[in-house]
Amino acid sequence: MLEINYDTKLLGVVGENISYTLSPAIHNYSFQELGINAVYLAFDIKSDEFKEIFPGLVKIAYGLNITIPYKEIAIKYVEAQSEAKRIGAINTIFNGKGYNTDYIAIKSLVQERIDKFETCTIFGAGGAARAAIFALHDLDCSINVINRSKEKAEKLIEEMRNKNIEIKITYNCKSDIIVNSTPNPDFVPDECVNGKLVIDFVYKPVITSLIKRAQNKNIKTINGIEILVRQAMEAEKIWFGKSLEDEEVVNYLYARKLIW
């Protein structure tokens, strides 16, 4: 049990309507196991109060995570670093600097899972697709996008073109890597569950219908909880220079019945 004292460091996640977040459970468990005197809270901030509250949080908190819908606006309040600056979104803050550990998580997990790939199809054109696009582009992957809203997909393509990243709208989903960045795993039709690797950002349940379909075809997978835990541990490395192993954190979440 954490004993809060004068030296206890304050960290937390900033978002709106984030009662679902697993971040406090993940980080408080990790801090306890690593012997770090810190506490991690959820800061649920309404959009009309963000500009008033957020700058103060940046000043008093030892470190922060940023989640929906503030990953893009929060970058204006910090000095964005490397990938975060290119992506135009941050999810981690430390010492007034902004980082994107979503990018680090996806890139590292893909490299661990498969070593040869050329093409990628991403379902969805929202915020979750951003880090995946940059990570896969930096791994020399040719990227296609499938999205219900053609207008939204075209807007994403134009935005990426301004960052020297070429992506295409496609209806041909035959690729080495398939990514679901939407909230609905069933948005990916069966004929598109192919290639070498399937990635699903959804983490409740951990084994989504998409992950299950991929496993039934003996395709390698990366599930949403792997991405969530990896980006969290990468954030801890930025804050404290150390972290737990991903597997230990995942096992803890299962034991607490926080994931299933």
Curated annotation (Swiss-Prot):
* Highest rank taxon of the organism: Archaea
Reactions accelerated catalytically = shikimate + NADP(+) = 3-dehydroshikimate + NADPH + H(+)
Q: In which pathway does it act?
A: Metabolic intermediate biosynthesis; chorismate biosynthesis; chorismate from D-erythrose 4-phosphate and phosphoenolpyruvate: step 4/7
| Catalytic residues identified in the record | K71
Q: Which UniProt keywords apply?
A: Amino-acid biosynthesis, Aromatic amino acid biosynthesis, NADP, Oxidoreductase
One Pfam family from the UniProt entry?
Shikimate_dh_N
Stated name of the protein:
Shikimate dehydrogenase
Protein source organism: Sulfurisphaera tokodaii (strain DSM 16993 / JCM 10545 / NBRC 100140 / 7) (Sulfolobus tokodaii)
Give the source lineage, highest ranks first: Archaea, Thermoproteota, Thermoprotei, Sulfolobales, Sulfolobaceae
Report which gene this protein is encoded by. aroE
